[in-house]
């Protein structure tokens, strides 16, 4: 929910995640990255701050954490007073090991409102270990897309997996085949009995 008088500004990070999640609706945005840079993103952040100084910023992609130094530059461009959300698969790599992720959240804990971490019933990307999620210094929420033939009978175990860390879970439907014409159709929608 956006604060009164504000707006939600979605910031597509200017680098591709190199993942291939089948439900991703942003991949085509990265086919032609011309004119897409950290500097341009910072210009846009400053412009939106001038237009709507109470706006929320949502970093998504791509994968915001795949280039941590660039993400920090963009975070530093956001003036105080804005809520900041990061949508991520939270990859752990040699470039961004667990200790560095924890340090990033510690350094930005007064700026980050919540990190929304994608976890799914079927694995599509390399995931960090669950213990790391409980060690982050900012609020965390798990986002789970109920994509195609996800295992219904595994939902309780999936929820329990994160319950021990006190992490809320948002289940959402797969939007990749949603059109204005079929938006309210429930027949054949495997997620409608659950959602």
Stretches found by the model and what they are:
Residues 41, 71-72, 97-104:
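Leucine-rich repeat
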Residues 1-43:
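Canonical Radical SAM [4Fe-4S] cluster-binding loop centered on the CxxxCxxC motif
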Residues 69-79:
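N-terminal active-site wall of soluble small-molecule enzyme domains
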Residues 1-5, 9-12, 36, 64-66, ...:
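Class I S-adenosyl-L-methionine
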Residues 43-52:
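A short, N-terminal amphipathic alpha-helix
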Residues 8, 26-36, 52-67, 80-97, ...:
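Core AdoMet radical
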Residues 118-195:
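Radical SAM enzyme [4Fe-4S]-AdoMet core and its adjacent flexible, acidic
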Residues 38-41, 70-71, 126-129, 155:
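Aromatic/hydrophobic pocket-lining residues that form the small-molecule binding cavity
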